[in-house]
Amino acid sequence: MERLQDVAGLGGYAMWNDHLYVGGTLYRSEHLGASQPNDGTCCGFNIRGIALYWRVAYQTSSENNNFEIGTYGMHMKSTPGAISGLEDSYTDWAADFQYDRAIPQWKNDVLSIRGTYILENSSLVASAAAVPPTAGFIGHHLNTVQGEAEYHFGNRVSTTAGLFSVTGNADPTLYPQAPVSGNLNGSPTSRGYILSVAWGPQQNIGLTAQYTGYARFNGGSTNYDAAGRNANGNNSIYLMARFVF
């Protein structure tokens, strides 16, 4: 499936009393380099009409503590490979929190704890009715849970450790067998951990190294793609350098 490459959005936000944040954005897509108006055949994925994103959060703080809890989500519809006809729809609901604690007795080091839960409900009417079908049935859901703890040593170095989990409906048509990206049993289940360290030698320079490890990937820990690949074959190291002028 070709991924959406061009999208425009218009949004706004408001903060009340330094505690309550409310924001929202409307998006729509239009693919360039194709016939206009867009007939949908240039790309495998289009936003049908308008996609809505929202965010509501509440934060409070004291001398050495800061706490935030919120919710966010998005709703959109798509007609795969077209601009009319049957639609697939997606609705994401999410909740998140973050707690930061400054530790004065340790030179104001900061401990941060973060967590996120996302529920994606999808109604794949168009995909299930396609010829050939790209989904085995209409109603699907995905659950994503992620939590992490980060420790800041002063304002130069920080380390992070986190866990993540993805579960949902098994559908061999939606998640077919294929080398590397494929799926032996049609399950989207993935689980793993993230470890990272960041260093800022100067205020405008940031260096980060992150390691992601998988215990399960696409429903399995061994031979998950029916081509002999194990979940830990997707373990990866990510390096980033940031310079601000």
Q: What do these predicted ranges mean?
A:
Residues 5, 49-51, 90-92, 142, ...:
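Membrane-spanning beta-strands of outer-membrane beta-barrel proteins
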Residues 199, 205, 231-245:
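Outer-membrane beta-barrel "beta-signal"
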